[in-house]
Amino acid sequence: MYSDRDEIILALFKQIEDSILLLLQWNQEVRDANDYLLSPEGMKNLAASCMLIEAIGESVKKIDRRTDGKLLPLRPEIPWKLVMGMRDHIAHGYFDIDADMVFLTI
C-alpha cells in the first residue's frame, strides 16, 4: 500500500510518461525545426508540444518538492535541472520560444 504522497508522485510520473509518448507521436514526422515554422499545422504542433514540455517540467518540480529533493538525485543520468529549466524558459519566454531548442528537446 502506498502513502498518499507516493500515490501523487506515481501519478505525476504517469503524467510525464503519457506526455512524452504524446510528444513522440506528434513529432514523429518533424525532421527539423523549420517543420514547425512553415505551416499553420506546424505552428499548432509547436505550441502544443511546448505546453507538454512545460507540463513535464512542472511535474518534475512537484516531484522534487514532494520528495524534499531526495528522489531525483537517485537518477543522475536524467538531466532534471535542464527539464525544469526548459519549463521555465517556455513558461516565461512567451514569444521568445526557439523552435530549434524545442526540436532538440523532443
Q: Can you name each region flagged by the protein language model?
A:
Residues 1-106:
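Solvent-exposed interaction patches of small proteins and small membrane subunits
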